[in-house]
Amino acid sequence: MSKWTHILAIITAVYTDHDNTIKSRGRLINVLNNNFKKLPIISGSEQNATVSLNINDYFNPDRYDYSFSISIYGNLRDRSIKETLKEYNNFLQKVNSFFTVTDHMYKIDNDRFKTLIYTSSKKKKKIIIDSEDKMFKRLDEMKI
């Protein structure tokens, strides 16, 4: 029987145009897309997670910082929570190498009633939710 992992995540980031070469929204889209193509995948045996780039409609050519978000959605066959989390963290690090990540959050769960939720807040906690028992446990207290 196959095991499934499901991921839902959003990353907000900023692209800083140090050379002030971005003069149009189209140029910004090209710069972001060129770096976007270099990002690693979050994989499953049937299909990979879908990754979407969302650019703010507002464009001001006098600014040097341009904010955008990346959304990730996937139903990943033959993956564990741990494997998906590792690939997500690799993806996040690569995003941060091209841009400046300002915030991120994710929910990763499986079909065995385990859910991992993270939001980058002041507390910086990862929480495991055991949906079957309605118990909350910290990540370091539970083996996944």
Spell out what each predicted region is.
Residues M1-N33:
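Short, extreme N-terminal segment that most often corresponds to the first beta-strand
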